[in-house]
Design a protein with these regions (language model features):
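Conserved polymerase palm-domain catalytic core
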Residues: 114, 120-241, 246-258, 262, ...
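Amphipathic alpha-helical blocks
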Residues: 28-51
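Active-site-proximal segment of RNA-dependent polymerases
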Residues: 80-141
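Non-catalytic, polymerase-adjacent accessory regions of viral genome-replication enzymes
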Residues: 1-36, 381-395
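Short linear proline/tyrosine/threonine-rich motifs used for host-factor recruitment
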Residues: 422-425, 431-435
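A short, charged, amphipathic alpha-helix used as a generic interaction element across diverse proteins
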Residues: 405-421
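Short, conserved non-catalytic motifs in the polymerase core
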Residues: 17-25, 50-74, 90-102, 176, ...
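Right-hand nucleic-acid polymerase module
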Residues: 68-69, 77, 189, 194-205, ...
């Protein structure tokens, strides 16, 4: 039987950063009863996965995403809590996605160290080979993955909920969300997706839904077999999801690995994306997970720089609207890029773009902190905009709700007499209207 305390912990993990969503709010209104019901359903084998929502994202490329109901996602977190540490003991240190203490930046830094080590501090030749998998998540064979996960649990897991965990993992892996889902995107958007990139058209028992927590966890587990085989022949390599880069002194060392890599992937029902294969000297630069790694320098790829430029431009429009929520959203977008660039050698670029794209009128609203580390709304404008938004919110209410606003006939009389009116909100949220006589 599954453990209620772990299920409760999974619930708290699941709602983190999601408390304002509709599903999380509805579940939280009576969360203890809902958790007990979910517990009983799993332990009695009556649990059924609910309807998912499905949509297509257009950036950075068209991609199909499925999102399960909140109660289903709680069980995904339950699975992660029970298996993640066991999986960690099986993973290679060269796997960097969705792992504590790892991540995208850590993978980039490791690859930079590998190149420096193999080239003996850039004094010798070194070559890099980049490989990518074709339609990775959509190519995963469900029965094979379910069998591998079940075998791992049988051999390595010894908790009291072992049988329940096996049943639950098999259910989520073999689930077909495309057969019971609500589309949130227009149908024509699916026309931009190749058939092998959609669960609706890529074939029976193929593909796991991008958007569910277990997809990343189980995908790492699936590719751990390839990681260890590569590690046996080439210890200088890094993998982030399906993006891999290998480093070696001699070209032949890397090229001899290709048959083994293809054979291992074929045994997992996967294959290489031949269009994304590259092989070159390290001095030409190495592209990996959004970064260009060169000797002693790391730059962002052009797509990231262009998106940063667009986010700065959006600040101009936000400042003109005076909408605080819009301004904060645009500011957060710019700061997210500045945060990324702070780890790279990009000071000149981020400074140049802000100076080029932020117009003079907008500059009065914002201040830049540090060496272009972040941008913030000036405090005096922050307060002014809040009061302005409060006034607009009240004035846009129905007339009967505006008890604290002077009579409209009085306002009309003052205007007809040539008075200038100033409408503003006080700190306690009340609306004040002051009239200034004609000069």
């Amino acid at each position: 039987m599954i453990d209620f305390d772990i299920l409760l912990e999974a619930y708290f993990d699941c709602r983190r950063h999601k408390r304002k969503t509709v599903g999380a709010t509805e579940f939280e209104m009576n969360y203890m009863s809902n958790l007990v019901q979910l517990l009983d359903e799993v332990n009695s084998r009556q649990y059924k996965i609910g309807k998912s929502i499905c949509f297509v994202v257009k950036y950075p490329r068209y991609r199909e995403v499925f999102a399960g109901q909140f109660r289903d996602r709680i069980l995904h977190h339950y699975i992660a809590l029970r298996l993640e540490q066991l999986f960690e003991s099986q993973f290679s240190d060269r796997t960097y996605n969705c792992r504590k203490g790892k991540g995208q930046l850590a993978g980039i830094r490791q690859l930079q160290r590998d190149i420096r080590e193999v080239s003996e501090n850039y004094t010798k030749d070194a070559h890099v080979m980049g490989i990518d998998l074709k339609g990775f998540f959509m190519s995963i064979h469900k029965p094979l993955l379910a069998k591998m996960v079940d075998g791992f649990i049988v051999e390595n897991y010894h908790g009291d909920d072992k049988e329940d965990l096996r049943w639950l993992c098999n259910m989520v892996v073999m689930h077909h969300p495309e057969k019971d889902c609500e589309k949130k995107s227009a149908d024509y958007l699916w026309e931009f997706l190749p058939k092998e990139k959609s669960l609706f058209t890529n074939g029976e028992d193929k593909g796991v839904a991008i958007g569910n927590l277990f997809a990343q966890l189980f995908a790492n587990f699936l590719l751990s077999k390839l990681d260890w085989k590569i590690n046996y022949y080439c210890k200088h390599h890094v993998r982030y999801v399906d993006d891999m880069v290998l480093v070696a002194r001699r070209k032949e060392t890397l090229l001899r690995l290709m048959p083994m890599i293809r054979e291992t992937l074929a045994s997992l029902g996967l294959r290489l994306n031949e269009k994304k294969f590259y092989f070159q000297h390290y001095s030409k630069g190495v592209r990996f997970v959004g970064a260009i790694i060169k000797r002693d320098r790391i730059y962002s790829v052009n797509n990231t720089v262009n998106n940063y430029r667009k986010s700065v431009r959006n600040l101009n429009g936000a400042a003109k609207t005076g909408n605080l929520e819009h301004i904060e959203k645009c500011t957060q977008s710019v700061n997210s890029y500045l945060g990324i660039f702070s780890h790279y050698n990009e000071y000149g670029m981020k400074r140049k773009i802000i100076k080029e794209e932020l117009d003079k009128e907008s500059w009065q609203y914002f201040t830049v902190k540090g060496h272009f580390q972040s941008i913030h709304l000036r405090k005096k404008f922050d307060t002014d905009i809040k009061y302005k938004n409060m006034a607009n919110e009240v004035l846009n209410r129905k007339i009967e709700d505006r008890n604290d606003v002077p009579n409209e006939s009085e306002i009309s009389r003052l205007l007809d007499s040539g008075y200038e009116l100033e409408i503003y909100a006080t700190q306690n949220g009340r609306i004040r209207i002051e009239g200034f006589p004609p000069s």
